[in-house]
């Protein structure tokens, strides 16, 4: 009998019923809520006279719309200038209070981006099914959990029934073997993967990351990679459970305790793909070939190593690709064959559910220490992923390093990742961003986003352009 993949095992563990149409009813262990995709779901419960099926399976926190300046946060809900944003945050508070759901409210130290808060609280555990009304829920797959985003109607379904109807996906494995070169990070791995397979490469697949380079990553690095599985076309990203996974989860608030912990660890150790498991697709990369990456266009697959030049549509034979490159160059204000290192930056954003954890901030601070933000850079933001990450960074003195260098040290939230709060790009502005999407207008109408690692973003901030971060730091 052929072995099972990690995805196969997780699916079978949670399959309640297989339906005649080929879909299945899947049990959901953890549901994370935020202010944007939950209001209609709660209203649906009220209209139907229902209550959440399992209240303790849900946690909530506002993140997308919250302001990130200290003054705005101290002002409370009334200080949220945008009326829609204010109503959404207030409505989440009211809904969680009404239905008895645990919420880390805007000024709770535990508040933050949903995909940072879940793991740091231990609300995300190996072997779980985890859903949230946000596509980057794939982040939680770093723990050997089956995690994916859902729509607003599905948020209501989970609240009401603790189950979802889903169709099983195919299995894809991305193997990254070898040692990463100095200065190359998890963000560079996943950008290189997307550059290789494209944004449709993982369509219809659960994407498991494996290989020695993945095993060498910390859990925070693995979260970065699983986070951007979505940009590779997959709905699910996974990394097998190992001793690092278990060590990260141990003693966190929601983690099992005592004998329950021992039983859980025994079960979790089986959350790996069997040696003889067969994947529908296998993609391989050599870690030593990966360099610091920079996206140049309007899709995450439009990415290059920092020492390369922007492509020339004139030499592209595929008419669709030719048109895509031409359009991207026009929107981004770049020229064919322009060196990546010639791209000048207006703003820098270090944050988002991709790269706002303590290791990300440490990496950026290492570059910023003793340097100053370039005079040509209008703004450089550092936005921790949660209040607890912020507190840890401040305990380590990272905030002082950033502030002395000329960065703005902010309160936790999604911030400039998306144009749903006051942190936005102006039209035509180039931003080095540690977020996950560089679509047209993603960070503000007419804004031009370049995806990079935290260290590369910090290097861009202090030089005013893209530079190989390895020119600034020592091994």
From Swiss-Prot:
Keywords, in A-Z order: 4Fe-4S, Amino-acid biosynthesis, Branched-chain amino acid biosynthesis, Iron, Iron-sulfur, Leucine biosynthesis, Lyase, Metal-binding
Free-text remark on how the cofactor is bound: Binds 1 [4Fe-4S] cluster per subunit.
Pathway the protein acts in: Amino-acid biosynthesis; L-leucine biosynthesis; L-leucine from 3-methyl-2-oxobutanoate: step 2/4
Reactions the enzyme catalyzes: (2R,3S)-3-isopropylmalate = (2S)-2-isopropylmalate
InterPro entries assigned to the protein according to its UniProt record, in alphabetical order: 3-IsopropMal_deHydase_lsu (IPR004430), Acnase/IPM_dHydase_lsu_aba_1/3 (IPR015931), Acoase/IPM_deHydtase_lsu_aba (IPR001030), Aconitase_4Fe-4S_BS (IPR018136), Aconitase_4Fe-4S_dom (IPR036008), IPM_dehydratase_rel_enz (IPR050067), IPMI_cat (IPR033941)
Subunit field text: Heterodimer of LeuC and LeuD.
Function description: Catalyzes the isomerization between 2-isopropylmalate and 3-isopropylmalate, via the formation of 2-isopropylmaleate.
Protein name, UniProt field: 3-isopropylmalate dehydratase large subunit
Organism of derivation: Ectopseudomonas mendocina (strain ymp)
């Amino acid at each position: 009998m052929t072995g099972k993949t990690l995805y196969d095992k997780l699916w079978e563990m949670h399959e309640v019923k297989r339906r005649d149409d080929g879909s299945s009813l899947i049990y959901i262990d953890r549901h994370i809520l935020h202010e944007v995709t939950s209001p209609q779901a709660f209203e649906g419960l009220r209209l139907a006279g229902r209550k959440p099926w399992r209240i303790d399976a849900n946690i909530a926190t506002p993140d997308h719309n919250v302001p990130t300046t200290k003054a705005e946060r101290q002002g409370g809900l009334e200080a949220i200038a945008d009326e829609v944003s204010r109503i959404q945050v207030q409505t989440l508070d009211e809904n969680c209070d009404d239905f008895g759901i645990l919420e880390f409210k805007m000024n709770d130290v535990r508040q933050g981006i949903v995909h940072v808060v879940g793991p740091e609280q231990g609300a995300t555990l190996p072997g779980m099914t985890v859903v949230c009304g946000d596509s980057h829920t794939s982040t939680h797959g770093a723990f050997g959990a089956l995690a994916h985003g859902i729509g607003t109607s599905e948020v209501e379904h989970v609240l009401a029934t603790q189950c979802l109807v889903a169709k099983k996906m195919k299995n894809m494995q991305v193997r990254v073997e070898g040692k990463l070169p100095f200065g190359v990070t998890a963000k560079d791995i996943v950008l290189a993967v997307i550059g290789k397979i494209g944004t449709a490469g993982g369509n219809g697949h659960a994407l498991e990351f494996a290989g020695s380079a993945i095993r060498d990553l910390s859990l925070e690095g693995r979260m970065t990679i699983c986070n951007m599985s979505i940009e590779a076309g997959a709905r699910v990203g996974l990394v097998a459970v190992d001793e690092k996974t278990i060590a990260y989860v141990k003693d966190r608030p929601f983690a099992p305790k005592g004998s329950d912990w021992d039983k859980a660890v025994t079960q979790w150790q089986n959350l790996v793909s069997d040696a003889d498991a067969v994947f529908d697709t296998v993609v391989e990369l050599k870690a030593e070939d990966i360099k610091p990456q920079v996206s140049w266009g309007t899709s995450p697959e439009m990415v290059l190593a920092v020492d390369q030049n922007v492509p020339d549509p004139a030499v592209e034979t595929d008419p669709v690709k030719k048109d895509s490159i031409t359009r991207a160059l026009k929107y981004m204000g770049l020229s064919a064959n322009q060196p990546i290192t010639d791209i000048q930056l207006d703003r820098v954003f270090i944050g988002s559910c991709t790269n706002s954890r303590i290791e990300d901030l440490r990496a950026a601070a290492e570059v910023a220490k003793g340097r100053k933000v370039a005079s040509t850079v209008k703004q450089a933001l550092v936005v921790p992923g949660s209040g607890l990450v912020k507190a840890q960074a401040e305990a380590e003195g990272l905030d002082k390093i950033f502030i002395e260098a000329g960065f703005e040290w902010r309160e936790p939230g999604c911030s400039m990742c998306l144009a749903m709060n006051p942190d936005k790009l102006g039209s035509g502005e180039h931003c080095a961003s540690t977020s996950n999407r560089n679509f047209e207008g993603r960070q503000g109408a007419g804004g031009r986003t370049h995806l990079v690692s935290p260290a590369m973003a910090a290097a861009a901030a202090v030089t005013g352009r893209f530079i190989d971060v390895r020119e600034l730091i020592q091994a």
